[in-house]
Regions:
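Phosphate-binding glycine-rich loop
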Residues: 27-74, 88-92, 98-100, 165
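Conserved SAM-binding loop
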Residues: 59, 81, 345
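PLP-dependent aminotransferase class I/II
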Residues: 33-39, 44-50, 111, 115, ...
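N-terminal "arm"/small-domain region of PLP-dependent enzymes with the aminotransferase-like
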Residues: 1-26, 346
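Active-site PLP attachment segment
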Residues: 169-211, 232
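Conserved active-site segment immediately N-terminal to the catalytic lysine
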Residues: 152-186, 215-222, 270
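PLP-dependent aminotransferase-like
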Residues: 65-154, 161
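Structural detector of well-ordered beta-strand residues that form the stable sheet scaffold
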Residues: 51, 76, 97, 149-151, ...
């Protein structure tokens, strides 16, 4: 593709950090960059605990396991989600309960959450989709009233805030992704974050093959655990990226605004919108085509390919997949509607104005 969908921003800073990690990061120094990354990211988020993991999926799996979620439990999440959000629920033997999204935020609808709660509900997962921020105040109030944990999937929300508080830091715990497509990257990677001391300690134990930090005997686990730890070399990339985080988030926001400005005059196209009191980290610009145009990603696929533009579809509702749901939940009207009419636009950090103009002009020519 001439204009790729996404790619990371890697400079000599990252290269130097990695070279150092490879040179000296062994033996009793094997976790130096990992420890530094956790501390630096905690400082950035203004949160007490960060546990760096091999993926956001792993971080979510650890967190849900630490909450004690298992067979017979229900976890409420939005039908519009990437599969990584639902997979840990299934692996733990719990039942995912899929509800509709808010048409303005594209995130889980608190009204639908309230309607879906039963005596088996153990958690609500709020995914901050594409950098948009969920209605956390309402969700946390619901969680408190029903004694249900509210979890934040902030995989796509680095730089996103509500009332100047970072997405991922408001619920019982949050998770982040540092995949190569994300705003900051470690190649592959994720993080579990929380202000809950006990939960953080349990997650660290689970993430170390069930071995507690307080156990004096070597190779002596106290429970069956996991191994989702991020490598020191990956963490070195992350440490370098964190020195540039304001630059990287700011560039993503510039790109979203460039698309917004370029498409503003087209009455049939709308973009990601910031809700009141929120700041979007702008991970992924999405254009939504008016219903009256009867077009979406499927209808424009060949046009994009011919122009060398690597655009992508909006996330399909999870209830489409038989391993998640017995049948599509068509009552989740907004999830199914936006899926058909929305398109992810190229937004890598080094995209040029000319490349964005190519995408903008293509949309204007096809949607009119």
């Amino acid at each position: 593709m001439k204009i790729p969908y996404t790619k990371p921003s890697i400079t000599k800073i990252e290269q130097d950090f990695v070279e150092n990690a490879i040179s000296v990061g062994w033996g009793d120094r094997c976790y130096e960059y990992l420890t530094r990354f956790e501390q630096d990211f905690a400082r950035h988020l203004q949160i007490k605990h960060v546990v760096a993991t091999s993926s956001c999926t792993g971080a979510l799996h650890l967190g849900l396991a630490a909450l004690g979620i298992g067979v017979g439990d229900e976890v409420i999440l939005a039908d519009t989600n990437w599969v990584a959000t639902v997979s840990p629920i299934i692996h733990l033997g719990a039942q995912p309960v899929l509800v509709d999204i808010d048409p303005e935020t594209w995130c889980i609808d608190p009204i639908k959450v309230e309607e879906a709660i039963t005596n088996r509900t153990k958690a609500i997962i709020a995914t901050h989709l594409y950098g948009n921020v969920a209605k956390m105040d309402e969700l946390i109030e619901i969680g408190l009233r029903h004694n249900v944990a509210v979890v934040e999937d902030a995989a796509e929300a680095i730089g996103s805030k509500l009332n100047n508080q970072h997405a991922g830091t408001m619920g019982s715990f949050g998770t982040f992704s540092f995949h190569g497509s994300k705003t900051i990257t470690t190649g592959e990677g994720g993080a579990f974050v929380t202000n809950d001391d006990s939960l953080a300690e349990l997650v660290r134990t689970l993430n170390n093959h069930g071995r507690s930090a307080t156990e004096s005997r070597q190779f002596w686990p106290e429970r069956a655990g996991f191994k989702y730890r991020m490598s020191n070399v990956q963490a070195a990339i992350g440490c370098a990226q964190l020195t540039r985080i304001d630059e990287l988030v700011g560039r993503k926001q510039e790109i979203l605004n460039e698309y917004r400005n370029g498409l503003a005059e087209n009455q049939y196209l709308t973009m990601n919108q910031d809700s009141p009191f929120t700041t979007s980290g702008a991970w992924m610009p999405n254009v939504v085509i008016s219903k009256c145009r009867n077009k979406g990603f499927d209808e424009l696929t060949d046009v994009f390919k011919k122009a060398g533009v690597d655009a992508r579809p909006f996330f399909a509702p999870l209830s489409n997949f038989p391993f998640v749901s017995k049948e599509p939940k068509l009552q989740n009207i907004n999830s199914f509607d936006l899926w058909k009419r929305s398109i992810n636009l190229p937004s890598f950090h080094d995209i040029t104005k000319d490349e964005m103009s190519t995408v903008i002009n293509l949309l204007h020519s096809e949607i009119k």
